[in-house]
Amino acid sequence: MEMQFPVILDGATGTELQKRGFTGDMSAEQWVLEHPESILEIQRKYVASGSNVLYAPTFGGNRQKLEERGIFNRTEEMNKALAQLSKQAADGKVWVAGDIAPTGRFLAPLGDASFEELVDIYTEQAAGLEQAGVDLYVIETMMTLTDARAAVLAIRSMSKKPILVSFTCDESGKILSGTDVVAALSVMEGMGVSAFGLNCSAGPEQMLLQLQRLHKYARVPLIAKPNAGMPEIVNGEAVYNCPPEEFVALVPEMLKAGVALFGGCCGTTEEHIAALKAALKDAEYVRPAPECLDLLPAATEKEAFFLPADATHGAVLTADGDLEDKLSDAMDDEWPMVALKLASWADVDALADYQYMIRKPLCLICDDTELLEAGLRAYQGRALYEGNLTEDALAPLVEKYGLLV
């Protein structure tokens, strides 16, 4: 599939379901299956108003979230059925995106999840969406880089369809786990996503500031799916007061910031989508022109680093012995990056356990493709490589993990 930019996404699902009787007493996914006419009405209105892409109502459809609601062993079945409802609403006129959202789980030291557990959770959900025949995938409202990476790997294990990724961040550009959105951009671009951006958390004005930051570094089209302003709590309920004409007032500035996909999150309606369609009439998308194409876009889990090709590291660390102390010392030395040798599976485990200490770009030293891939899979950033492996051996790892060589 080839999108002609700018593309109009859909608007809110959750707040629209609430208008139709959803109270939150059960899983939204279960409620939609019991009230299919609600999502069909919502999404048909979005199509009529100008949406080119519908998000399947599978936001909370991963196994973790379903089990928290007492729903077991139905992940694939429910995701397939929910996505088929969106296919019905689309009626072949627009694309349907399988919607994947946070698990709410964290890796150590913040939580007890393993990365492979997250991949497994998302793989089950993606399988149901793929069976339904979705046209693309959207990974949205991401609050940790680990969830986003796991979701991309899960999707790529069964599909080559386009993947859109959007995070939610605070006014400083940090997501819940402390990752800067520029670091998330670097990692996601390296993993081959088709577009990157922001959704939820803010209205258009606040979101624009972070999109302008991203524009300086983005090599892919950007996504803007803001709320209808910041909510006010009225009688215990969140009320969004940004009218359609105000919602689209900054569309010209967003286009200048490289935004190619526009939509609405919480509080937006078909009227906001219609306003977007009008605002984007005859608009021309200008692809981002990053300022740092000659630099290497490395990243830790938290921060982005743009390095010259001749950047160097100090002594190569080995994972045997006390890696914790070695990393602590390396973070305080004068070298711009840290190098770690992977010579065994125990080394990969050590990297996974102590990567939270890494605050510099990481260069992996390894001559075994299986070990190197395991290290790249475990490392929640974007690493550089040094070693004797051939370009042909490295090519799949560059494509899959964004390895910098």
List where the protein language model places each region:
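Domain-level signal for soluble alpha/beta catalytic cores
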Residues: 1-405
